């Protein structure tokens, strides 16, 4: 598997996580929607599924890991940033095969692609604190 296939899986997964957070639809429905309506060429579909279902099933645990390192209330974090840091935290915590530098860098890149102007700085700082306190 190529790194680019995982990168594409992360991009698709963060969009699906964002959609799931806002819609509160069943994860299986969100997954089906994304896999049938989005271009999945070059996407590691199995990894996309794992990220989406993993984040959804472990959201409470992931959020508890993040909250001590926030500079604001969790409710004040934008939905896009929540989706990104939840995905990256899932990889940092539950995917030991993903080097922490890769998980952080991918989170930063997702924030640059989907977040507000300085989202990448917030994501970088938060994930860096999380790694240092693990």
From Swiss-Prot:
GO BP of this protein: DNA-templated transcription termination; transcription antitermination
Is Transcription regulation there in the keyword field?
yes
**Keyword ATP-binding (UniProt):** no
MF terms in GO: RNA binding
Domain of life, per lineage: Bacteria
Q: What pairs make up the disulfide bonds?
A: none
Q: Which GO terms describe its cellular component?
A: cytosol
Q: Which UniProt keywords apply?
A: RNA-binding, Transcription, Transcription antitermination, Transcription regulation
InterPro entries in UniProt: NusB-like_sf (IPR035926), NusB_fam (IPR011605), NusB_RsmB_TIM44 (IPR006027)
Q: Which family does it belong to?
A: Belongs to the NusB family.
Q: HAMAP family per the record?
A: NusB (MF_00073)
Summarize the protein's role. Involved in transcription antitermination. Required for transcription of ribosomal RNA (rRNA) genes. Binds specifically to the boxA antiterminator sequence of the ribosomal RNA (rrn) operons.
Q: What is this protein called?
A: Transcription antitermination protein NusB
Q: What is the lineage of its organism?
A: Bacteria, Pseudomonadati, Pseudomonadota, Gammaproteobacteria, Alteromonadales
* Name of the coding gene: nusB
